[in-house]
Amino acid sequence: MEEDWEQLSEQEKVPIPAKKPDVNKWDGEDEEEEVKDSWEDEDELEEKKDEEKVETPKAKPKKTLQQKIADKEKLKQEEAERRRLEKEEEDMTPEQKLAEKLRLQKLQEESDLKNALDTFGVTSIVGGIDGMHPTNKEEFIELSDAICKKLSNYKNDTEYCAFLEDLVTKLFASLPSANIRKVKGILDNLYLEKQKLEKGDKPKKKAGGKIKARLRMDGENQNFDEYAPKYDDFDEYDDFM
């Protein structure tokens, strides 16, 4: 009986055929597909993390009442300053407008130069009048020309003459009287020359005016002659006395 059971069990054991290798795939191709799948999974995880990291934009903090008042006051001041400048520009003469334009242009050029120097790390630059250190006559003439060119930008300003008076007084205060007298002579000659030029520019009087005045005087003399006999009568009275 036991032998029959053993025979039956042996018959039931059917050998499982071995799995044939897939000849259509290269060695290691399955491994690459598994690696590729793992990369895609990692990419999806990273995308999810990036989405989680994206923060919603923060709302701007609301201004306090004091900040709003300060902003309004600042706008009022800017508007008042703009109107003041416009009013001043309207009252300016063409010469003053040109001088103001040149002044603003000069300030803009200086600002641009300063920004350029800061960009290249240059802390200071010496040039122009400040860079001049004359030691002979020619160099002093160059300095004089540079100063005149600088001051000529303001010659149409209403305060220019007062500025020159103050400047000359300060410059000559430290000089000996002999030097001051010499400069005074130069200024006197310049004054006479300018006076002649100014008189030459005025229109001359017509000759007819002088003739009329002369004729009038002649007529007046004739009137005085009419009273001459009366004065003679007084002379006869003196003889009688």
Curated annotation (Swiss-Prot):
Residues 1-97 are annotated as: Disordered. Component of the eukaryotic translation initiation factor 3 (eIF-3) complex. It comes from the Eukaryota. One of its GO terms (cellular component) is eukaryotic 48S preinitiation complex. Keywords: Coiled coil, Cytoplasm, Initiation factor, Protein biosynthesis. Residues 46-58, 69-87 have a biased composition (Basic and acidic residues). InterPro entries: eIF3-like_dom_sf (IPR023194), eIF3j (IPR013906). This is Eukaryotic translation initiation factor 3 subunit J. The lineage of its organism: Eukaryota, Metazoa, Ecdysozoa, Arthropoda, Hexapoda. HAMAP family: eIF3j (MF_03009). Component of the eukaryotic translation initiation factor 3 (eIF-3) complex, which is involved in protein synthesis of a specialized repertoire of mRNAs and, together with other initiation factors, stimulates binding of mRNA and methionyl-tRNAi to the 40S ribosome. The eIF-3 complex specifically targets and initiates translation of a subset of mRNAs involved in cell proliferation. It comes from Aedes aegypti. Residues 28-45 have a biased composition (Acidic residues). One of its GO terms (biological process) is formation of cytoplasmic translation initiation complex.
